[in-house]
Every structure is written in C-alpha cells, then in structure tokens.
Amino acid sequence: MDSQRNLLVIALLFVSFMIWQAWEQDKNPQPQTQQTTQTTTTAAGSAADQGVPASGQGKMITVKTDVLDLTINTRGGDVEQALLPAYPKELGSNEPFQLLETTPQFIYQAQSGLTGRDGPDNPANGPRPLYNVEKEAFVLADGQNELQVPMTYTDAAGNTFTKTFVFKRGDYAVNVNYSVQNTGEKPLEVSTFGQLKQSVNLPPHRDTGSSNFALHTFRGAAYSTPDEKYEKYKFDTIADNENLNVSSKGGWVAMLQQYFATAWIPRNDGTNNFYTANLGNGIVAIGYKAQPVLVQPGQTGAMTSTLWVGPEIQDKMAAVAPHLDLTVDYGWLWFISQPLFKLLKWIHSFVGNWGFSIIIITFIVRGIMYPLTKAQYTSMAKMRMLQPKIQAMRERLGDDKQRQSQEMMALYKAEKVNPLGGCFPLIIQMPIFLALYYMLMGSIELRHAPFALWIHDLSAQDPYYILPILMGVTMFFIQKMSPTTVTDPMQQKIMTFMPVIFTVFFLWFPSGLVLYYIVSNLVTIIQQQLIYRGLEKRGLHSSEKKKS
C-alpha cells in the first residue's frame, strides 16, 4: 500500500461516513433516547396532568443586565423573551441573538411558579396569578453586581406569594426564589415547577444553520439525574406522546440547540418529577415538579430553583449543576472532542487566537502520531520492495486466486510485512478529524471566532474558498512526492482527480477544519521527507520517484 492508495482509503472513509450520516438523519436515532425509553412511560401526558398551567396574558416587564435582556409576563411570571447582547445574531450584525421568543410564528418560553394543592399556578385554583411589580423596567446599573426583581401576589384567602428573580453580573444563571406567607388557619401545600416549552417546527428566522455538510447538531430536550448523567429526548418523541416520567433527587431538565441552551435546575434536597408533554398546536415541553412543601399557619416558607438561559459555556455550566456542561453537543465522538477542546482552550489562553490555537494543536497531534506515521511509511516501503516478487508470483500462478492469496500471505509473513500497516494511522486520524469537526460545530467559543485576513468565523465555511483550494494544492504535492505502485489505469485516473474531489468536499467545511487539514498536510510533507531519508539509508526507498 502506498500514499496514493491512502487517498483512496480516506475517500472511502469520507463517503462511508456521509452515507452513515444520511442514514442516521433519516432514521434519526439517539442512543440516549433509546436508553431513556426504558425509564419512561408512553401514557398520554400533558402539562395539566402535572398540575402545570398554560400561559396567560399579563403585563410585560423588561430586565436588562450586562449579558441578558429578558421580557417577563406578570401573568405567572414566565420568561417569554430572551436576548443575548454579547452574541450577535449573525457575524457583523448589531442585532443580538434571540433565544426565547413569543410570537405568532414561534414559541419558546421558560415557565415557572408554584403548583401543588394550594399553589396559585395550579389550574384547579383558577387562572394563573397576576403578579404586582413596583416598576416595568429593571436595569443592572454600572457598579451593581446583583439585581432583584420581586413580584408579589395575594390570593383570595390573604396568603402572599412572592416570586423573586435574582440576576448577577456576567451570569446566565438566574435564581428564582419563592416566599409563601400563610396567613390562614390551615397548612398550605405547594410545589415549585419549571417548564420549558417550544414549537417543534423552526420558522426561517430561527434557522441557525445547525447542520453543516452531513454533520448535524442536536436540537431537542434533555435531562440529567444522578443515575443518568445526560439523556437526550427528541422533540418528535414528545410529539408522539412517548412521555418522560422520572423521579429523582437533583438533576436538571433542558432544551438544546447549537451553541445555546435553557435549563431548569431544581433544588436537590427533595424528590423532583421530570416529565415531557405534548401541549398541542406543534408545541412540546419538558419540565420538573418538585416535592410538595407544607407551610404551616402563621409561617413563611421559602423555595428556590435556577434557570440557565444563554450560551453553552462549559465551565460556567458545570459550576451551576453537575453534568450541565454535557449539553454541548459533541456527537458520538464526545470522548475525543472534549479533551481536544480543553487542550485547544488551554493553548488559546496563551496565544489569544483560535486559528493559531488550531495550528498548534495540529502540530501536537501530528507529533504524537509521528511514530505511527513512520511505521506507516516503513510498511509502505516494504510493500513496494515486495512488488517484483508479488508480480512474479501472479504471473506464475495465473488465475489461481486461492494459491495467490496463500502464497502472498506466506510472503508477508516471511518478510515480516503487515499489509494493513499503512492503513492503521489513517484509521486513527479519521476520528480525530471528525472530533475536531464536532468541536467546531458545538463550542460556543468558536462561534464567530476570527483567525486572520479574510477568515472572520472559523466555524463557518471560507467565503472565498481559498482555504479549500490551498488544501487541494497540498494534497497534490503530497501525491506527486509519493512513490506509487499503482499500475491500473482506472486507479491512476482516480488518483489524478483525488485532490480535486477533496477540494470540492471541503468547500462547505468550517474554515477551522480546513485550516487543520492544510497544516496537517504540510506536516505530512515535512515528515515524509524526513522518513524517506531514513528509509534511503536502509535501502527501502529511492530518492527518484518510481514511475508506474
């Protein structure tokens, strides 16, 4: 096997991967979801079944911090709009990215409140509470590190319910604190709940381009418990009324999309019920209902939960709740993508540029793999040295394929040559390549991250296709510098067009990935020359390329 045949192996790996991805998209399986169904029920579920109310109409108040711009409905205290000022909707745009939305075209809300037997949000107790607020606009002032937004409601019996949103500077985690003052003569039984609801179908203005040439990031629901660290739950599964029903201490529920997430994190000192629901009209929900709390007459009870609404910043999410950082979608190669990202982030802390960080990590990866690369070229050189013997054997045995195979294997054994030795490094490199792809598509830090010159977003394709062309040029040079034993005319034609085919493949790949491949090819050229010099000394390589 020689370097040019390696290109065929890479091409086959690419084609196989894309066929697999297309099949996955049609079948759309999620291994985590299959595990989930073992712990769920398929009984028809709804928010009402959980004692969770529907939305209502109230007055809208606004809350602005340095990182959040929210709109809260005083009817129930739901967050109906969420803008993220630090993240533009598009590269170069002054319009902030909108995560939560309540419009005729699309619904995505974070609901919360107090349900249970005596909770004001229990549908059996009438309409949702209409909270009173002291003003309609709250702003985190300069020099202020915390902003509280209290909302109060008094029921017909005179009991007072206070719901307070607590915001902190630079934080996407919002604490929601409840105070229940029982002025009656009987205990009040209440339960906190948190629910995320969203339209299943995306309108055009919500399409974030979460798929990129065969690789698709996950959009749907997820949850975590101490027993199940991270489980995805597809919107289609919820829409089909295959509903989640899990009880657990601790954990969280979330809705995910590329780069951003919302999540409710209840307190972990009581049992919480996690559920999903098909709300109808193309809207699905995931939520939690906490264990009931009794507030005795004349007493005041306190409860709390936390809402995450923002980008999937892994270290910050991990500090909010265990395993919340797993919401970053690195696909089935997460076990490679996660350490790769940690290394990349560490390098970035020194160089300050994600593009240069990718270049450095490429050198590190190729340096670690150098022994395998050297073994690959040595194996290919030995295979070339055996070609005259193999050709003579084929001429001697004619059409006896069985004898040919037997004697060829005996020859390999005698000469201590592994015919698959040239493939092994490629098999190792391919998962790293794909893991880097998932990392670029799933890490918020690389969204709109510039490199240099015309590359302003490493997670997007090169707008001028310069990098893919350069990648094709490097492949052409590798091909021309590599000895070949290919004699079949058809294979020779395929080899000739391989750099062109790969250039077309890479036109739609993220710039960061193409940059990685260019640098990797340049390293290959350097390593190839160093290895060939060593092989020449051993008589396994000639500096003059053999002609086919």
UniProtKB/Swiss-Prot annotation:
Region (Disordered): 28-56
GO biological process, one term: protein transport
Transmembrane segments annotated in the record for this chain: 6-26, 350-370, 424-444, 458-478, 499-519
Chief location bin: membrane
Pfam families the UniProt entry points to: 60KD_IMP, YidC_periplas
InterPro entries: Membr_insert_YidC, Membr_insert_YidC_N, YidC/ALB3/OXA1/COX18, YidC/Oxa/ALB_C, YidC_ALB_C, YidC_periplasmic_sf
Record keywords: Cell inner membrane, Cell membrane, Chaperone, Membrane, Protein transport, Transmembrane, Transmembrane helix, Transport
Membrane topology: Multi-pass membrane protein
Location(s) in or outside the cell: Cell inner membrane
The protein's assembly and partners: Interacts with the Sec translocase complex via SecD. Specifically interacts with transmembrane segments of nascent integral membrane proteins during membrane integration.
Protein name, per record: Membrane protein insertase YidC
Organism: Salmonella dublin (strain CT_02021853)
Gene: yidC
